[in-house]
């Protein structure tokens, strides 16, 4: 399947980081998602019930990251990927989480993972 549903630039404010001062503040994460989804059914039915609800996906990603409050971006990525596959039945995904400002000389740092089969 070559169909992909996108969520790009999802901003999530959460506690994340390994330093004591980071545990006392929220920081912005930027999340990009590519999720395999057969779009032929919703295209034919024109019914949102047949589609991957990207608003619900976005809300759950935000909730997951805000509840988790991880130290590492890697931990955050694995938790989000697992949740999306379990809760939404996404067979394959590519997930990027960026933490802008984490390294002063860089625009952003982050991780990108792929899970599942296309």
Regions found by a protein language model. Name each.
Residues 1-118:
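N-terminal, polar/charged subdomain of small-to-medium soluble alpha/beta proteins
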């Amino acid at each position: 399947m070559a169909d992909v549903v996108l969520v790009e630039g999802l901003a999530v404010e959460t506690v994340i980081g390994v330093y004591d001062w980071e545990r006392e503040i929220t920081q912005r994460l930027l999340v990009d998602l590519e999720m395999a989804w057969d779009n032929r059914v919703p295209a034919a039915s024109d019914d949102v019930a047949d589609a991957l609800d990207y608003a619900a996906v976005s809300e759950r990603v935000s909730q997951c990251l805000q509840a988790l409050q991880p130290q590492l971006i890697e931990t955050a990525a694995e938790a989000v990927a697992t949740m999306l596959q379990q809760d939404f039945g996404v067979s394959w995904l590519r997930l990027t989480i960026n933490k802008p400002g984490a390294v002063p000389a860089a625009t952003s740092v982050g991780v990108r993972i792929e899970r599942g089969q296309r």
